Each structure stands twice: as C-alpha cells, then as structure tokens.
Regions:
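Short acidic/histidine-rich active-site segments
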Residues: 105-107, 134-160
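Active-site gating/metal-coordination segments in enzymes
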Residues: 1-50, 102, 107-112
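Active-site glycine- and acidic-residue-rich loops that bind
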Residues: 81-87, 107-131
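Glycine-enriched alpha-helix->loop->beta-strand junction motifs that scaffold or abut catalytic
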Residues: 47-50, 70-77, 95-104, 134-136
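Short amphipathic alpha-helices and their capping/turn segments at secondary-structure boundaries
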Residues: 2-12, 94, 122-136
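Distinct, well-ordered alpha-helical segments
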Residues: 31-35, 58-73, 89-97
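Mid-to-C-terminal alpha-helical segments outside catalytic/metal-binding sites
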Residues: 165-186
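Catalytic beta/alpha-barrel core
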Residues: 50-57, 78-86
Length: 186
C-alpha cells in the first residue's frame, strides 16, 4: 500500500504521497504498530521517501521506533521523530539525535495535556539542543489543532484561549524568547 501510494498515487487520484507517517503512543510500540513500522521501513527502502513518526516522548517511544527502523536498515537521516518536546529529558533527546534522526519540536504552545511542559519549558529545551550543537537537526512547528466544527463551542473556545495566536504562536512568542535566551538568527 505504501509503495503504491508513493509511486502511483492515493486512491486513484494521482496525488503521490511524499512522506510515510506512522504512529505509536503512550505505553510504547504495540505489536501491530511494530508491523506497520517495519512495513514503512520497507517502503522507505524501496522509494527513499522519508518517515515521520507520532510518538509520546514521556514514555521514550521514539527509542523503540528508531530501534525498529534501524533494524530494517532505514537511513535515519530520513526519519523525523515527532512530538519530541512533550518531555524535557535531554538525555533521551540527545540519544535520538546522536543516532541521526530529526526531532520534531512541534507541540507549541503545549501544556494542555497534564504533565507536559508549557511553551516556556519547551523553548528552553530548544535552546539546550541548539547549545548542544543540533540546531540543524530540529524542526519547530505547532501541531496546532485548529478548532473544528465537530467540537462543541466550549472545546473550540478553550482551544482559542490556550493559543490565541494560532499559527503565529512560534513567530510571536517562541522566536522572541529564543532571542532573549541568546539564540541568534544564524
């Protein structure tokens, strides 16, 4: 399925997939998720298309994902471990980076899930990774859940209150804080 959608297009549309997305969450990589990760690895090997993962960093799920992809021979320079800033464990993140993957620091503004870091802590983490020499291996983004009609008015309003800047949050809050912390435009 992966290779077909990459080479021929998705469901007869002619629109070709440009990335393979896989997901594991709280509790680690389940057996069915491992099967999917291995299939994604085989599709990557056949096509060269990069792999993006959904993960839960407080459980260090990225370690197992990377281990499976490594076993399959995936070029880890073509792997993005998403949601890596849901925890501030630098040793865990540096371990992933040393293997050659990209980190998605993509849950800004954060802090909505109990026990996860607020945006300021996430930004301090970015500074630490930059200071450790990995500015070229991290990607900042929002993973912003746009208030959707399927949610009731109360949920939509709560999301707006949590992030009134929407897709401008990084520009308006994170980048200025990084500058305050001494990060330059270089």
């Amino acid at each position: 399925l992966y290779v077909k959608e990459i080479e021929q297009g998705i469901e007869g549309t002619g629109i070709k997939a440009g990335i393979i997305k896989v997901a594991s969450d709280r509790g680690g990589v389940t057996q069915p998720q491992e099967v999917v990760l291995r299939a994604a690895a085989q599709a990557h090997l056949a096509t060269g298309i990069p792999i993006s993962t959904h993960t839960w960093s407080p459980d260090k799920v990225g370690d197992r994902q990377v281990s499976i992809l490594e076993e399959e021979g995936v070029d880890l320079n073509r792997v993005y471990i998403g949601h890596s800033n849901d925890d501030t464990d630098m040793d865990y993140l540096l371990g992933l980076l040393r293997k050659g993957v990209w980190l998605g620091l993509d849950r800004y503004p954060g802090g909505r899930v109990p026990g996860t870091p607020k945006w300021e802590e996430r930004t301090d983490l970015v500074k630490g990774l930059i200071d450790a020499g990995y500015v070229d291996r991290i990607m900042l983004s929002h993973d912003y859940s746009v208030p959707k009609a399927r949610h009731g008015a109360e949920v939509q309003e709560e999301r707006r209150r949590a992030n009134p800047d929407g897709f401008n949050f990084i520009k308006r809050s994170v980048l200025p804080r990084l500058k305050e912390l001494g990060v330059t435009d270089q």
